[in-house]
Amino acid sequence: MQLPAASGAPAPAQSSVAGRAAAAPQAGQAAKPPLGAATAGVNAQPPVAAGSGAAGGGGAGALATPAAGSGAAGVAAPSGAAGTTAAASSADSATALAALTSYLQQARASRPKLAEQPFATAALSKADAQSAKDLLWKDFAAYVKETRKGEVGATENQARTIKVEGNDKVLKYYMAKRGTAPATGWSLFISMHGGGNAPAATNDSQWENQIKLVQDYDPKNALWVAPRAPIDDWNMFFIKEIDELFDRLIVDLIVFENVDPNKVYINGYSAGGDGVYQLGPRMGERWAGAGMSAGHPNASSPLSLRNVPFAIHVGGEDTAYDRNKKAEEWGKRLEMLAAEDPGGYINQWQVHAGKPHWMDMEDAVSIPFLQSHTRNPIPDKIVWEQHEYPRAHFYWLAADESNRAKGALIRAQYDKMGVHISEVKDVKKLSIRLSDDMLDLDGPIRVDLKGQMLTEAPVKRTIAMLDRCIQELGDPNFAFSAEVPLELP
């Protein structure tokens, strides 16, 4: 929904939910404006309830989806096996869980590959799958703590550096804490600075300014992380390598700083706002919300924002590259998408009348809007559109490398009857990842495409599938226990 035009102080974000308005924070003295990259309102659909349908806790890494019939953990039986189940015997399930416990007690360096152990592919009961997930997450977190100590401990005055093997870019960041950690963990803001195609010293100055903006934006009970862009160019926050670096940063902070993975937000100003337009949809499964200030969308698309509350704030006089016009176009597009898809595309947008590139902190109204929302890691409906740098996974869907072309599109949802795919473009193989928080995995799982049944077959909860998800994504909320691989017509 479009926010009302500002006059003097920032206008409160109007909510259509229960007729209540969210009060705007009191802006402090404005920091110097970042460099970089009218009319107004909020489409505030009901926020996703905290933990809605979720299991518990964020991640990193590329995904390898097994082919159908490969014997991989969690693979569904062939189509036509309807009426049968892969229910685990209690004895076999308990034996597998005991074997996992013994395996994890071994010294890490001497462990054989988990996926090759007989217990890894044994069928688990629902209760034992939850216990296995807890054990595997605890072991993963211990490994992160053992191997990544040098990547954490950043402060407002001391930066830390993240480097991922095989990635030639590095990510430096400052961090500030506001308030106290709730029982569920800190909220996290990844706040991207302005600058862009400028000398390194200019971008360094913008980076140092971004950590100071925590005082004006004033997030509640949150970690405010200001990363330094890996390059000094116009696309500095949406290069291919940034996904892996941000994934790593999020996992580190979940493990070391007790960040709630369902309360991770991204925002940015100017060139940082350019990055939000790109990474908001591209890495949508990571975010509880995304806030764009004074940026330009370039060729990005909002379709994948179905489950990511998105805020847009631009000055009415910010005419460079038509930022003001593009902001209004995106705001109206999100409103249209929200009207067509009730419950999705929650948005807040405002073109601030009379304001140039620097909005004197009027965009701070985006912070309480974002923090009013919590990520649902297993939304019942998703829209996944691949962007310039495709990703291997999106919520509970995954695609192998040959099915990740730019522009590839999948619309899918699930309910108690099964999984329903309503639209597919340029995807021939797809993996549906499942947990007991989504469907009853003790019965056959039905999948249909445009109403035509593709399969109705049992699935198997396995330790191998749980471990693969945790190792790839570093988020216990994405620790799926079963999988249905599909070949689409």
Language-model features: locations:
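Ser/Thr-rich, Pro/Gly/Ala-heavy low-complexity intrinsically disordered linkers and tails
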Residues: M1-A86
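A domain-start/cap signature at the N-terminus of enzymes
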Residues: A27, G36, A55, A68, ...
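Gly/Ser-rich "nucleophile elbow"/oxyanion-hole loop immediately N-terminal to the catalytic nucleophile
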Residues: G179-T184, W234-A271, R282-R286
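Primarily recognizes the serine-hydrolase "nucleophile elbow" in alpha/beta-hydrolase
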Residues: N262-R306
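Active-site machinery of serine-nucleophile hydrolases
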Residues: G185-L188, M192-V255
